[in-house]
Regions:
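Acidic, small-polar-rich N-terminal luminal/periplasmic segments of exported/outer-membrane proteins
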Residues: 46, 53-185, 724
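Outer-membrane beta-barrel translocator/receptor signature
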Residues: 129-131, 143, 151-154, 160, ...
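Transmembrane beta-strands of outer-membrane beta-barrel pores
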Residues: 194-200, 224-228, 268-272, 407, ...
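Solvent-exposed loop segments that connect transmembrane elements
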Residues: 231-239, 276-385, 430-504, 546-585, ...
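Structural signature of Gram-negative outer-membrane beta-barrels, strongest in the C-terminal barrel
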Residues: 255, 520-523, 529, 533-539, ...
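Membrane-embedded beta-barrel scaffold of Gram-negative outer-membrane proteins
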Residues: 404-407, 411-417, 424-427, 686-696, ...
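C-terminal beta-signal and adjacent terminal beta-strands/loops
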Residues: 794, 931-941, 961-1015
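C-terminal beta-barrel architecture of Gram-negative outer-membrane proteins
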Residues: 827-868, 887, 901-963, 975-979, ...
């Protein structure tokens, strides 16, 4: 038996170099087929085993052993640096186009997701774990690294399918492992490249390799990217979503003996530009304002702002209901609730009438135009009209120490790592320009009563006036800058004063992690070998915040606060802190450890068996709260946190008493494992069958009002994977063909939805199956074709009732959809007897008459009606009167059984070809690639056509001229040749934002020229 090299073994996964084109395959525990590499060598291609076509066998360590790719059964796609260059794979978005059953798209809240075989990062939140393991130099890292670009890469390997036994707790979909180039101790070398392209794109990459002694070497690499934005902004006649970023990496390697190697790697990246987390928002405008956007199609419209928190709640109808809802603390089952609510409502309306609030329409008060009535949404995916330009600032550091020593038949590998990541990003929340609208007269009134020079001056309003309009209404309205003090404009924290409302959000995060792993493996000559290891991970994040603000929220906070303060006897202005929405995860902690091992049985030269097991243990803690208009404070307060911390508001309604934070701890443990049986028919043909179990830990949902039936936690997910495959080489190497079939039984798959402006997560079970075929065809040594095709079927396997936020009626035409004017969410009224539409409408009409609101109006094309009202009041009124209806505060759920999982295209294929032409000492290599991704759905509800993402294709081409011995080269390229604006993914916002759809697309057509050198 040959010695097994575990030089590259690590915390997540180890891989090896590939030939000069994409190579895919499936991996086995065939130890005796593994080439021998000393610790001073890179595990990579085996030139001694090169076939007649001239491309070398690929050696990988995906099972923590050096093995030929064609000998091992885990579906793997691998890319060398040369391959990345020739297929124009500069970032993960381009990478996914060439992979079977893999998609990658941007997501909501500054996130992104890899989806492998239908399993992706559908869980959004501080305590969520990624379903796809991401590793840099085999150290687990966060997904932020996927926002950068690839440089000085030795190889990238994507493992498809659960990898939990060897690679950890959160690899249920697979692993993406990025291996950077290491120092060469034998020679000095350097490389550099400059690229210029459209969008005034300038990209510089370089590296230098220096052997310091015979046993010590250093390698330094870096890149810089600067380009204009892809998104045109007609409001400013500029563009945004540009890049200004750089990264560098240093690697120090020490090989004191042939059996020992130590690598120390330091990585740093920084970005400061106008990258946008949003690209385009689509909406089929709802003329009633009850939904904002209709659940029919994705159109180039704008939401009806009357459906938003700033439009519905800050109306002359909504604000009194907001005050009454906040003041009446009786349960809706109390007989006194309805009369108390109506009395409170009657007392607040006269106080608010002079302040120029907008109107959604009610008896005697006609509707006023909503804030987006004149907003423009240009019908182009890369053109917007926005008055707030995004900002994006990130800083990442990753440090890795790897040590390996071979004691003979036993080898020990150690990996230790530390990382830190910071994010501070803002963006226009609605990608639209909205004026002050109906609030403008209110600011004139505020000037009249708050300016000491006015004959109507009242000192009660002076502080409110000075904070919002210190220069009078003509000088613009000052707006809060969302920050941790929670005071905004009323504590002097403002972004400026404007003639329109700047609707924007802000994401902030600061996280650290530490990990350590050790494993021991054997290389005995008998039929039995083993691997044993353990890993510990600790992560801490603080002040993970998400803010949303506009002038309407500032005005609501100050106006309601001042009136409430007057009711409490105050004679000066007050406000309700915070005057903006803030989801604040003050602290998150993760402690995780795993113990794993595998046993390898080689019965003969053809038949092998692998048995593995892993124990996972995860502990999570989070302290969080969501603030908006919670604590009454005097204007001029500079920090609202003492009020929040001191009992000024209750942030955990699930626990009796006043809680300053919602705190929760969870602990999960699971056993996972795998069994693999492979049979080598010939040296060129392998078949295998495997079973594996993957696991991803559960987590904690953000704190929400108990009005919404949202569980406090979400469960861990597990997947049982069954896979068969065959790997083949034919025609003396002219064809390599690998085929894999798989079936997954998924339990408690985590997926997210937006409730009350917050991501919450649910669990479902699913069945997944599919087939993948991958081929490399080389008719001649100069002509190479690579191709792959995949089929994927996913479906929810259980009866699971979930409420679709787009349509809380659940498709029933006898329902009445309610826009709650106190909180801007949607509830639904259903008749007790199905089909009794008159009963549900009659109940709402009678109740709204008591509230002074209009009755029901036609809303959806199927006959469903809607109305503005107060959901809690309707619930109390039903209990008081016994009306034959049900009031469902979180909507009427629908059964999603049989629906497809999001981001799971049924068909996906790609084909690429390159031809090498010798011209004297030069070579000319033209290449073209065609990639197709089939249709998919963006949500679990599978509504047609609004949730459907159509299939699309991307065409890339380039031609490169290499100098003698490849010392220099010149390359011309074009990516997305047809300028396709295809959608890669979508996300539906929540009801208080109007239910518009954020969509994300492929990158636009790029073209340019690059020149580089190597020595």
């Amino acid at each position: 038996m040959r010695k097994i090299d575990l030089l590259s073994a690590s915390a997540m996964v180890s891989v090896a170099a590939m030939p000069a084109y994409a190579q895919t395959g499936s991996v086995t525990s065939s130890q005796n087929s593994a080439p021998t590499n000393g610790p001073g060598q890179e595990v990579g291609t085996s030139t001694s085993q090169a076939d007649a076509r001239g491309y070398a066998d690929i050696v990988i360590t995906a099972q923590r052993q050096s093995q030929r790719l064609q000998d091992v059964p885990i579906a793997v796609s691998a890319f060398t640096a040369e391959n990345l260059e020739r297929q124009q794979i500069v970032n993960p978005l381009a990478l996914q186009q060439t992979l079977p059953n893999v998609t990658f798209t941007k997501g909501q809240f500054a996130t992104n997701t890899f989806t492998i075989r239908g399993i992706g990062d559908l869980c959004v939140g501080v305590t969520c774990d990624s379903a796809t393991g991401i590793a840099l130099n085999e150290q687990p890292v966060g997904g932020r690294i996927l926002e950068g670009e690839f440089y000085d890469i030795e190889r990238i390997e994507v493992l498809r399918g659960p990898q939990g036994t060897l690679f950890g707790r959160n690899a249920t979909s697979g692993v993406v492992n990025i291996i950077t180039a290491k120092p060469d101790l034998t020679k000095i070398s350097a490389a550099g490249e400059f690229e210029y392209g459209n969008y005034d794109s300038k990209r510089v990459k370089g590296m230098i390799n220096l052997p310091l002694t015979d046993t010590i070497g250093v390698r330094v690499a870096g890149y810089y990217l600067n380009r204009d934005g892809y998104i045109k902004n007609t409001y400013t006649n500029t563009s945004f979503d540009g890049r200004d970023m750089y990264s560098f990496r240093g690697t120090l390697s020490w090989e004191p003996t042939p059996d020992t190697r130590v690598d120390l790697i330091a990585y740093y990246s920084k970005e400061d530009d106008d990258r946008s987390r949003l690209q385009k928002q689509l909406c089929d405008r709802d003329p009633t304002g009850i939904l904002g956007c209709l659940p029919t199609r994705r159109a180039f419209g704008t939401p009806n702002a009357n459906a938003t928190l700033g439009g519905a709640t800050e109306s002359i109808q909504g604000l009194p209901l907001f005050l009454a809802d906040a003041s009446v603390t009786l349960p809706t089952s109390n007989a006194a609730y309805v009369p108390t609510f109506l009395a409170t409502l009657a007392g607040t309306r006269p106080l608010l009438a002079p302040f120029g609030l907008g109107s959604i329409g009610s008896p005697g008060i006609p509707a006023t135009p909503d804030a987006f009535a004149n907003a423009i949404n240009i019908p182009d995916f890369r053109t917007v009209t926005a008055d707030y330009l995004p900002t994006w600032k990130t800083e990442d550091q990753i440090y890795t120490l790897k040590a390996y020593h071979n004691f003979g038949n036993i080898a020990v590998s150690l990996t230790a790592g530390h990382s830190r990541s910071k994010l501070n990003a803002t963006s226009d929340y609605n990608l639209a320009v909205s004026g002050l609208g109906a609030n403008a007269p209110g600011f004139a009134t505020l000037e009249a009563v708050g300016n000491p020079a006015s004959p109507l001056y009242n000192p009660l309003f002076a502080g409110l006036r000075n904070a919002l309009i210190p220069n009078g209404p003509a000088g613009g309205v000052c707006q809060s800058n969302g920050g941790p003090n929670g005071v905004g404009v009323y504590g002097g924290e403002t972004i400026g004063c404007f003639a329109q409302s700047l609707d924007f959000d802000r994401s902030v995060a600061d996280s650290k992690s530490w990990m350590g792993e050790v494993h021991v493996d054997s290389s005995f000559d008998g039929m039995f070998n083993f691997l044993l290891g353990g890993i510990y991970t600790k992560a801490v994040a603080r002040d993970i915040d998400y803010y949303v603000n506009n002038i309407g929220l500032d005005y609501l906070s100050g106006l309601v606060g001042t009136i409430s303060g007057a009711g409490a006897g105050r004679t000066t202005s007050s406000f309700l802190a915070s005057p903006f929405f803030r989801s604040n995860s003050d602290r998150f902690e993760l402690d995780s450890y795993g113990i794993f091992g595998e046993a390898y049985f080689e019965f003969n030269d053809q038949l092998k068996l692998t048995l593995g097991a892993r124990y996972n243990n995860d502990k999570k803690y989070v302290r969080a709260r969501t603030t908006f208009a919670n604590a009454l404070l005097p204007v001029g307060t500079t920090d609202a946190n003492p009020a929040f911390d001191g009992g000024g508001a209750d942030f955990d309604a699930t626990i009796p008493g006043i809680q300053p934070w919602a705190e929760a701890r969870v602990r999960y443990s699971r056993m996972t494992g795998r069994a693999v049986l492979d049979y080598q028919i010939t040296s060129d043909n392998l078949i295998y069958a495997s079973y594996s179990r993957g696991y991803k830990s559960g987590g904690i949902n953000p704190p929400l009002s108990p009005l919404f039936a949202v569980p406090t936690t979400f469960r861990p997910e597990t997947v049982d994977s069954f896979e068969i495959g065959s790997k083949n080489t034919f025609g003396n190497g002219s064809l390599r063909l690998n085929v894999t079939g798989f079936y997954y039984k998924y339990k408690d798959l985590q997926l997210t939805r937006i409730v009350a402006r917050t991501s919450v997560n649910d669990n479902i079970s699913a069945n997944i199956y599919g087939v993948e075929a991958e081929a490399i065809i080389s008719p001649t040594p100069a002509f190479v074709i690579n191709a792959n095709i995949s089929y994927l079927r996913t479906e929810v396997a259980q009866d699971r009732l979930l409420t679709n936020p787009r349509d809380v009626s659940g498709g029933r035409d006898d329902a009445v959809i309610i826009k709650d004017l106190a909180g801007a969410y949607n509830c639904v009224v259903l008749p007790t007897t199905a089909g009794n539409a008159a009963g549900s409408r009659g109940f709402v009409n009678a109740s709204n008459a008591l509230l002074g609101l209009n009755g029901t109006v036609p809303l959806l094309s199927n006959g469903t009606y809607g109305a503005f009202s107060a959901c809690k009041f309707l619930q109390a009124q039903q209990l008081a009167t016994g009306a034959p209806v049900s009031v469902l505060l979180d909507g009427n759920p629908v059964n999603v059984k049989g629906n497809r999982l999001p981001n799971s295209p049924t068909y996906k294929w790609s084909v690429g070809a390159q031809y090498t032409i010798d011209i004297g000492n030069f070579t000319l290599i033209p290449r073209a690639d065609l990639n197709y991704t089939g249709d998919q759905y963006g949500t679990i509800f599978n509504l047609n056509p609004i949730d459907r993402v159509p299939g699309y294709e991307v065409v890339n081409a380039q031609i490169q001229l290499n100098g003698p011995e490849d010392r220099f080269y010149v390359r011309a390229f074009v990516s997305n040749l047809t300028a396709n604006d295809a959608i890669t993914g979508l996300f539906v916002t929540d009801q208080s934002s109007g239910l518009y759809t954020n969509v994300f697309t492929v990158e636009p057509r790029r073209y340019g020229i690059a020149a580089g050198f190597k020595f």
